Amino acid sequence: MEGNGAKGPPRRRVELGAFVVGLAHDASGATLAAATGAGRVAFLPADPMAGDAPRDVEAHRGASLAFCRGLSGTDFLSGGDDGRLVRIGADLQATEVLKARRGWIDGVVAHAGRSMIAAAAGKVVHLVTPAGTHELGPHPSSVADLCFSPDGSRLAVAHYGGTTIHLTQKPAEKPRSLSWKGSHIAIRYSPNSKFLATSTQENALHVWRLASGADMQMQGYATKAKSLAWTHDGNWLVSGGVELCVCWGFAGKGPEGQPPLELQPPGDEPVLITRVAAHPAAPFVLLGFADGQVHVADIAKKRVTPLDGPTGSPVSALEWSPDGWRLAAGTEAGTLRLFDLRPRG
């Protein structure tokens, strides 16, 4: 482990020893949890100056494949290649929520306001609600990603050939299908629920205007964008898959016929952006790069500021704390970095 760096904001570096699959803070922002490809979840203070050693919990006998904060604000959910969805409480005890009949659980999301959890296993999604557990699907292909609408009334699923939108309060009703050729690999609702965005295997983004069903395609990406983020106000859509921070504007009439805002990261050699994460309350986007660099893009000021340099391994997970002052970045090699951006004086 390493302590605070000599320059820049307070930071901490911890070696977890395995691919960082996902990161999540508890609702207070005091605790950070990191799930790894070794099937373990590490818990540590989000404050990089704390210095406490991580506390490990075994969640799966194989790998953790998906991770998020749970319903209580102090618990976390992990899906694994053992087909189990596991809840880890504040007491660091792991309990099984469900076991998929076949395959592994490689997608999980939670909506605290509706007390709902959705977990993807193959072509099926298991929707856990206060009224019981419902099996949604099968979908046209294995589920690549899923997300709740901001109010939790809908669950959107990405798969080959487009997306499927389920009504969470009426899971037995026929879902809405939005079709577009190719494999859709990431999916996010805009904060105002007006748009649904996906990234595709064909190195493009696709966006539907949900009221009318009209859609638009954004092409020209260097590779497939595995990470999508909307700014807190829904005015910008940002993704990985390119060397620039490409921001598509959705204020007013949207981006049709308009070029995106492109922000150039500093440095002489272009490096692919692998992960993005939007600030919870300001027009900032955290950028993780293929060489391990971490930057912050300020869309309002149209600039990108480096936070930390290369580690030699791609950034695989990014996370802001709920108040937006602390952040964390994990890499494929298992390096976890914590930062504190609070003003010092």
Residue ranges and their predicted role:
Residues 1-345:
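WD40-repeat beta-propeller superdomains and closely related acidic/aromatic-rich repeat-like regions
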